[in-house]
A protein has these predicted regions:
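Active-site loop-to-helix "anion-binding N-cap" substructures in soluble metabolic enzymes
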Residues: 1-230
Length: 230
């Protein structure tokens, strides 16, 4: 199985997300049965996007980009894993932008991961070399089974820069992660992924998919990535 994950970040209103979906439907990309495609949307887009997905019968799954580390309670503004469980199958946690802009720690990411797994949602845990071992230790402390998660290697310098790391470098990181966790762990690569380089990453021995930011925002670019992996 190959994973293709789109991270829309803080882009696309409800109206824009539906227009994106309609355009992708018209482009009619080739979805391989071995390709699992997950669109991680803003919270506000999820209900209507899911409804439109059902109508158009596109083989897409939906995910979120963040989750509360808490269960239900007095936590104003928080969106819990239980709330999301009726809307999504996957959720990104620990993205470098949240670590930088909101000072999220590896411990907090592990708490969020625990909440997601408790509700049957697959966490997509973002990692980079400087905090790799720290994050793994935090997950172990929470008794997280790494084989129930997806991990995304997202080197900070490659995000949105147009300069991805080499496939070999990504594979080396994934190999180290497998050594630290489990040989069966699933690793994605994220950072300036395009239709031109996507297949070079998933062809690596320890890379099972890609996490796409900028090129997931335009239906044509994303359709080209789908076709390149199918």
């Amino acid at each position: 199985m190959t994973y293709l994950v789109a991270n829309w970040k803080s882009h696309h209103t409800i109206t824009q997300s539906i227009l994106w979906l309609e355009r992708l439907h018209k482009l009619n990309p080739t979805f391989s049965p071995q390709l699992k495609t997950i669109i991680c949307l803003p919270f506000t887009d999820l209900p209507e996007f899911n409804r439109q997905l059902t109508e158009k019968k596109l083989p897409l799954l939906t995910g979120a980009q963040n989750v509360s580390p808490f269960t239900a309670g007095k936590h104003t503004g928080e969106v819990t894993a239980r709330m999301l469980s009726e809307l999504i199958t996957h959720c990104i946690v620990g993205h470098s932008e949240r670590r930088q802009q909101f000072e999220e720690t590896s411990s907090l990411v592990a708490q969020k991961t625990f909440q997601l797994l408790d509700q049957g949602i697959v966490p997509i845990i973002c990692l980079d070399t400087p905090y790799l071992e720290e994050q793994i230790k935090a997950l172990i402390k929470q008794d997280i089974d790494p084989e129930r998660c997806l991990f995304a290697y997202e080197p900070q310098a490659a995000i949105g820069s147009g300069q991805p790391v080499t496939p070999h470098t990504a594979n080396q990181f994934a190999t180290k992660l497998s050594f630290l966790t489990s040989p069966q762990v699933k690793v994605l690569y994220g950072g300036s992924v395009t239709a031109q380089n996507a297949s070079t990453f998933v062809s690596q021995s320890h890379i099972q998919g890609i996490l796409v930011g900028t090129d997931s925002l335009t239906p044509t670019d994303f359709s080209n990535i789908i076709n390149s992996l199918s």
